[in-house]
């Protein structure tokens, strides 16, 4: 007991004597409530808690709903920006899409006040994300949509001059308002270039799912104004030959991610030569494509052209045995085109009535650079064993395998 009592003050002294840098690192993992408690321990900890490095990143969730038992999330968000916004460099706002106009009105008011406060305190934002607004919902009236878009445009005109990463995924604008925002982005870059420029842009589901964006030439024109773009994420409905030509002008693109889903336009024709020119203009380019519920091999072949430098492919396909579709052509004919570039493969298939074991094994065998495989499908146990054997005995590049056979069986394998 005496030894234990001697250890307690010793441990306290050790904590109090830790260097400032170590304490900042430890405190960065604490939630706000624990940070408040830690700030009361001593003067040193109180001073460290005022360090800007602890308050540079923040994520808020806005719902627009009212609770009888606690304050709305946006109240604490606005208070945070008022007191600590001068340190804020990375801000993420995730929205729960409103079902009623009253909720949409509250959301609009909260986001407007948040951005007004960011402008007032001159927050040095480098990264901004506003996700899942879904302005095509009926809860958003015409005036509310216009007000929300105007709020974002106003922030781009009057807010931080240091932004290099912007995410507006899930916004679902009509074509007119979407183009207004894209124009504001290009004007933002024109104002501050070369002192500051946008290098990362996420516009997945930026336009409403019913819009044939690829028919509008203003989208490539605006994106071509972003001269140092290295990371771009779009919905497949935006893809066109004109867009690929616009992206090759500055030779900076390194990661190009495309998301395609059944309910959005995806039947446009894109020339393989356009992809080849882009790949030659941007030698470090890696293309990532995710496909959701497109169960038509002709459409998949039209999208997955051999000229694409595809490094990552994700697909979810839920189909009944009665449907006239099989993933076998995808596994045996289409994906082997990328044997020299494919690094990550993620497949979620409910192949109730057919075996895909041999096709999958052959695909893994021919893909020279495949590092990670994630698959949710009906596979035989011996297939998993053969996959592991490949990684151990055949000098395969495959280092990580995730297999889920059903809701009750999960297997993760890591190899060195």
Predicted regions and their residues:
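The conserved beta-strand core of Leucine-Rich Repeat
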Residues: 1-416
């Amino acid at each position: 007991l005496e030894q234990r009592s001697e250890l307690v003050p010793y441990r306290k002294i050790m904590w109090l004597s830790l260097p400032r840098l170590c304490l900042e690192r430890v405190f960065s993992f604490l939630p706000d409530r624990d940070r408040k408690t830690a700030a009361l321990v001593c003067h040193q900890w109180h001073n460290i808690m005022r360090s800007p490095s602890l308050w540079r990143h923040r994520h808020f969730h806005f719902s627009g709903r009212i609770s009888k038992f606690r304050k709305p999330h946006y109240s604490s968000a606005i208070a945070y920006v008022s007191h600590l916004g001068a340190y804020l460099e990375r801000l993420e706002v995730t929205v729960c899409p409103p079902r009623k106009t009253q909720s949409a009105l509250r959301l609009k008011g909260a986001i407007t006040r948040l951005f007004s406060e960011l402008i007032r305190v001159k927050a040095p934002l480098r990264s901004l994300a506003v996700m899942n607004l879904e302005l095509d919902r009926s809860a958003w009236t015409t005036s509310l949509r216009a007000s929300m878009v105007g709020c974002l445009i106003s922030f781009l005109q009057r807010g931080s001059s240091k932004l290099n990463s912007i995410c507006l995924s899930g916004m679902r604008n009509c074509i007119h308002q979407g183009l207004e925002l894209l124009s504001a982005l290009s004007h933002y870059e024109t104002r501050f270039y070369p002192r500051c420029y946008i290098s990362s842009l996420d516009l997945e589901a930026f336009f409403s799912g019913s819009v044939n964006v690829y028919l509008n030439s203003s989208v490539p024109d605006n994106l071509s104004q972003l001269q140092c773009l290295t990371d771009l994420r779009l919905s497949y409905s935006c893809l066109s030959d004109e867009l690929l030509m616009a992206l090759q002008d500055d030779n900076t693109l390194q990661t190009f991610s495309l998301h395609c889903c059944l309910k959005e336009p995806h039947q446009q024709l894109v020339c393989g030569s356009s992809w080849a020119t882009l790949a030659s203009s941007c030698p470090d380019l890696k293309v990532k494509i995710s496909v959701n519920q497109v169960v038509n091999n002709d459409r998949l072949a039209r999208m997955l052209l051999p000229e694409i430098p595809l490094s990552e492919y994700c697909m979810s396909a839920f189909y009944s045995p009665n449907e006239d579709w099989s993933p076998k052509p995808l596994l045996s004919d289409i994906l082997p085109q990328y044997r020299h570039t494919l690094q990550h493969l993620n497949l979620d298939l409910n192949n109730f009535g057919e075996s895909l074991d041999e096709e999958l094994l052959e695909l893994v065998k021919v893909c020279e650079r495949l590092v990670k495989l994630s698959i949710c499908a009906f596979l035989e146990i011996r297939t998993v064993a053969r996959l592991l054997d490949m990684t151990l005995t055949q000098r395969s590049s495959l280092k990580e395998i995730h297999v889920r056979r059903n809701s009750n069986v999960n297997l993760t394998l890591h190899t060195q």
